[in-house]
Structures are given as C-alpha cells and as structure tokens.
Amino acid sequence: MPHHEFECSKVIPERKKHAVIKGKGETLADALPQGYLNTIPGSISERGCAYCVAKHVIGTPMKDVIHISHGPVGCTYDTWQTKRYISDNDNFQLKYTYATDVKEKHIVFGAEKLLKQNIIEAFKRFPQIKRMTIYQTPCTALIGDDINAIAEEVMEEMPEVDIFVCNSPGFAGPSQSGGHHKINIAWINQKVGTVEPEITGDHVINYVGEYNIQGDQEVMVDYFKRMGIQVLSTFTGNLSYDGLRAMHRAHLNVLECARSAEYICNELRVRYGIPRLDIDGFGFKPLADSLRKYGMFFGIEDRRKAIIDEEVARWKPELDWYKERLMGKKVSVWPGGSKLWHWAHVIEEEMGLKVVSVYTKFGHQGDMEKGMPRCGEGTLAIDDPNELEGLEALEMLKPDIILTGKRPGEVAKKVRVPYLNAHAYHNGPYKGFEGWVRFARDIYNAIYSPIHQLSGIDITKDNAPEWGNGFRTRQMLSDGNLSDAVRNSETLAQYTGGYDSVSNVREREYPAFERKVG
C-alpha cells in the first residue's frame, strides 16, 4: 500500500497515513487510509462539527418545524440555507431559523431564561407551527444549560406544542459525523412511538437517510408509490415532525445514506424488529437493483419490472449521448461521506468517466471499505484533506472536473478546474433514472463550458487571443473526436426533461392496489 505524502504536509508526518494510492491487485486491507480520527493540529481541516451536521443535515429537512439553536448567532448562520432541502410546504424550514443569540453575559450568568423566552416568542411568531427542535451548541453545553428541562417546562405550559431536544454540541465527535449518531439516537429515544399512524397499504416502509436535496426524496417516493408501497416516514427529507414519530409501525426500513442514518435503522431493528434493506438511488443499475430488492421483499416484482422497463426505455438513450462525450474524462469524487462509494463505480460504468481520486471529510473506515474496492488502480484516496492538499492533488492528477462542496469547489475554480456541487447540487434532483441523466448533463456542461476559452486569457497583455477557427460552442468542443455514426445518431439525444421535474412528480396520480390485509 503506497501511502501518499503531500509536499505541503511533510511537516505533519501523521498525515501520511491518511492518503493512499491504490496499487495493482491490492487487497481491501492494503488500500485504506486511516479515517474518522481526531483532526491533527496544524492541518487546517475543512471538517464541520457535530452540531452542524445534527441541525444542518438531519434536522433542517423536517418541513413543519421551528429550528432554534441555543448559542451564538454565528452557529445558526453557518447552518442556514446552505443546502437545498426543498419541501412541499413552501420551504418553510429553509426560510426561517432561530438563534438565542447568546452573549458573554449569558455565559457568565446562564442562558436558560433566554432560551425559554425565545421558544415562546418563536411559537407566537408562527402560530400555525406547533413543533420545534432545539439544538445545543458548545458554549451553552459547557456552561451546563439544561435545555431538556426548559423544553419540558414549555410543553407543560403550552400543551399543544411538542419539542425535540438535540444535545449534539460541536465537540461531540472527531468530525461532524458525531452529530449523525447523536440526533439518530435522540430521536428514537424521545419521539419514536409517540404517535400512531394510519396504515393504508399492505407494504409499509420508512425511507431512511434521505433529505430531499432539490427533490431527491420526492423522486424516490414516486417509485415507491407507483409500486403500491406506503412511505410511512422519511428520515428526514420533506416529512412532518409527527410523521417521524410513527416510524415504529413500518414493515421495512429502506436505508439510503448509511453514514448519516444507519444508527436509527439499527435501533428500530433491535427495539421493534423492523428489518433493514440498503438501497442506492444513483445510477441506472444500482437503482434498478434496489427496486428489485424491495420488489422481492414484498412479492411485487411485476410492479417494479414495469417501472424499470418504462424508465430505462425513456432515459437510457439520453444517458448514452453524454457517455459518448464524457468517455475518458477524469473526475475527482470529493463529497462528504457515503457518496464516494455510491458514485465511484457507477460514474465510470454508466458515464464513461475515469475516477482518479476519492476523499471524505467525515467518513468512517466503513465508507472507505466500500469505496476503495469500487475504484481502479492508481486512485488517490484521502481522508480529511485540507485546502493545500486538495490543490496539490489537483496539480498532480489534473482532473477535468471535481464533484465536491462549495468550499473546495470554489478553490478549484481559481485554478481553472470546474466543479459540481455534490452536497446541494446545481440543477438536481440527481436521483432516479431521469435525475442520473440530469447529473450527466451537468457534468458535461461543466467540462465543456465555453467559458474555459476565456478564463485562460491573460488580460494584462495587449495581444488579442488567437481563436483559430473561432470561438467554439460546447458541442463543438465535445464532438470533435467522435465518429460520424455517434455524432449523427438518431437514437441518442441530449436531455429532454424540463427544468423542474419535481412539480410533475407532485401532480402525479397513483394506481390504487387492492389490499390483501384489512
């Protein structure tokens, strides 16, 4: 296993074991960087904190909730409106967020009275909202504010409201992934089993680890409904607070993002006997395999086959149009956690791209254990990289595009490497058959953007650029080396879907399947 030592990190020798280049024929154990350890002092990590992920990733997608952070306003601002967790209630949870705005005097004298005042004010400001989540931050955790007691006090005085308390201060784990565990366990301990749902079908699931980034959840739920499956709750995208309290009545937990939500799945299995089925909504083959899994589980294979046949016939020619033009282009897959193993292999197989690097900021060893076997020889894998290591990797690998978040992505743009936002998306949804074509389209648009012809011009020089055959369009750039048969194909086509695919899903009417059980 050739560990890779970055030049910029030679002064921090411990960093060497956090990056590896996968060699030929290496076993799984040989090709894993160390992961999910405390950040090494001096490495200037880009990780977030446990508070951030509890509120920002898992809590915020709940659509009918007032989200209030007990701490300084900076904590709240950093977790507000940075991901597109849309909902079908006019995106209430994205428009508003609350902070108790703790100051120095509250650190000295305590901030429990301030918290209670803010809770009551928030409910009065939005009388139609009766549910709230309170998030603990480091400073109020360190001074010992009892937010559980305050929540109980308010619920006694206002019996029509319900409050969930998330004790996940920023220091509650080596990275933001500590917050995944904290909020998972807190929710099942405090709220699951406190509401009894209406069961309307024979096949009932919880869709776990899906947060409806630009409509991903709604696309997947559409497939479930077309198969006659009742989605009791989604943890936590585009779902109501009370819906999540009824998770204990599902027949199956369908798990998407294992990194953020496997903990509640495991607890639901232990406490309520609900089995877990891991699925993947990214890519034609992984999605088709996932549909087969729960089709077989519920004995409704005929329904899933009809959906797969219809969707593949509709969208496969468009995916292949992009595959022909992306073939051999190099990509660095630099998301946060589980997307590195959701995407690495299927991007190569279905889009023709070559994955040259994967990294994770907060992933565990399990993420690398799943991801590295899906990568080819020579792939650079990095755990918890900093900005300088990222720039050095770009210089060494020279990818045509990176799939990452906004912070490393904007840095990459400065060195003329395009990126797609792997966290909040550019033009999602990216799940589903159509979504995967949208993803390929966005990758294509980024790589072949005509702007790159201008970005390389040195504007300090007086000489006009030599355009040769003139300014080239995106398709002129992508089609130059294609055969005439591919270029003029009558079966392949660019993406023909609309700008807003989610509205169509929301308007769909679903078949009524006869129930076998009363």
Swiss-Prot record:
One of its GO terms (biological process) is nitrogen fixation. Its EC number is 1.18.6.1. [8Fe-9S-C-homocitryl] cluster binds at C257, H423. Binds 1 [8Fe-7S] cluster per heterodimer. The keyword Iron-sulfur applies. GO terms for molecular function: ATP binding; iron-sulfur cluster binding; metal ion binding; nitrogenase activity. InterPro entries: Nase/OxRdtase_comp1, Nase_asu, Nase_comp1_asu, Nase_comp1_CS, Nase_Fe-Fe_asu. The keyword ATP-binding applies. Disulfide bonds: none annotated. [8Fe-7S] cluster binds at C49, C75. Keywords: ATP-binding, Iron, Iron-sulfur, Metal-binding, Nitrogen fixation, Nucleotide-binding, Oxidoreductase. Transmembrane segments: none annotated. Coiled coil: none annotated. Its cofactor is [8Fe-7S] cluster; [8Fe-9S-C-homocitryl] cluster. It catalyses: N2 + 8 reduced [2Fe-2S]-[ferredoxin] + 16 ATP + 16 H2O = H2 + 8 oxidized [2Fe-2S]-[ferredoxin] + 2 NH4(+) + 16 ADP + 16 phosphate + 6 H(+). PANTHER family: NITROGENASE MOLYBDENUM-IRON PROTEIN ALPHA CHAIN. This iron-iron protein is part of the nitrogenase complex that catalyzes the key enzymatic reactions in nitrogen fixation. Other nitrogenase complexes utilize a molybdenum-iron protein or a vanadium-iron protein. The structure of the 8Fe-9S-C-homocitryl cluster is assumed to be analogous to the 7Fe-Mo-9S-C-homocitryl cluster. Hexamer of two alpha, two beta, and two delta chains. This is Nitrogenase iron-iron protein alpha chain. The gene is anfD.
